[in-house]
Amino acid sequence: MKFELDTTDGKARRGRLIFDRGVIETPAFMPVGTYGTVKGMTPDEVKATGAQVCLGNTFHLMLRPGTEIIKQHGGLHKFMNWDFPILTDSGGFQVFSLGAMRKITEEGVLFSSPVNGEKIMMTPESSMQVQRDLGSDIVMIFDECTPYPATEKEAKDSMELSLRWAKRSKEGHGDNPSALFGIIQGGMYPELRAQSQAGLEEIGFDGYALGGLSVGEPKNEMINILDHCAYKMPADKPRYLMGVGKPEDLVESVRRGIDMFDCVMPTRNARNGHLFITTGVVKIRNAVHKTDTGPLDPECDCHTCGNYSRAYLHHLDKCNEILGARLNTIHNLRYYQRVMEGLRNAISAGKLDEFVQDFYARRGQDVPELADITN
């Protein structure tokens, strides 16, 4: 992987990640394909929304169908017929989401498979091996996702364990030519985040991610961590904010220097009739849309908006038709990509402030202030 930084506008950055399989223009949003599929979408449909990369979930793919069958296909790209880059998460977040079904030790995490109850030990080494078997282009280290809320001691202990696992992940990654990203932890404590980042930089990674956000904390706490941490992340490496989020969160994070995002929100919300448009949100199952012959978003160039009315989408939702979820997903993913395209173009033109003002004005919202934190 090669990372090129073209230009900046304030703290916002415009660049690209270059792989043998393709280029990812940044800032980038990555749709989530948990089980090797973006729910309800073919790979060509995902590409048509403007996506240049997608996510696979190490934890879920390890359990079903298992890495052996994926290896027999020649890796995840061929298994799912996706020839653009793939990022795989380490499985850490999913393991820690199991709660009482798992036990954390220095070695790793022992958990009961939610599929068949089998006891499985997941370690930094095994996570690296699974991701090597999947053949992903970007591999994430195995870390502990610090829960929220957490005391400073709990966050410190968790962060230090993640650092020890980061070193083992780097060693386990070995001669794998794929890019390896470190994950900054430390809960809602900027000092712990700084210690985590320093430790990760000492080990050395191809990119750096902020983990442990969007885990239930109030938005102001997430923004505070971004204010204190994003601009300090290595300038010559891609910066990835994991699991975030709403369109407004993407804009605010880009303003603070983040390059990469992933979130299930556009796809999950689409299946629940919650659709993102230029002026905010449309809840398509509400009765007001029953007789609306207009498009979902007149400014959107997606297949859904170009061919179907709000009334039709409302009808499909009410009848629980699979096509409704598919058309909604096409639109939401395209909307997210349009936001990212707008951000990229604005940064390139030195007009990010104008883009941000227009983005919020169309929603009837004020532009949030940027904190002046530079040390």
Swiss-Prot record:
RNA binding: annotated segments: 243-249, 267-271
Keyword terms, alphabetized: Glycosyltransferase, Metal-binding, Queuosine biosynthesis, Transferase, tRNA processing, Zinc
Positions contributing to substrate binding: D89, S90, G91, G92, F93, D143, Q185, G212
Record carries keyword Metal-binding: yes
Cofactor remark from the record: Binds 1 zinc ion per subunit.
InterPro entries in the cross-refs: ArchSynthase1/Queuine_TRR, TGT, TGT-like_sf, tRNA_ribo_trans-like
Known partners and oligomeric status: Homodimer. Within each dimer, one monomer is responsible for RNA recognition and catalysis, while the other monomer binds to the replacement base PreQ1.
Record protein name field: Queuine tRNA-ribosyltransferase
Gene: tgt
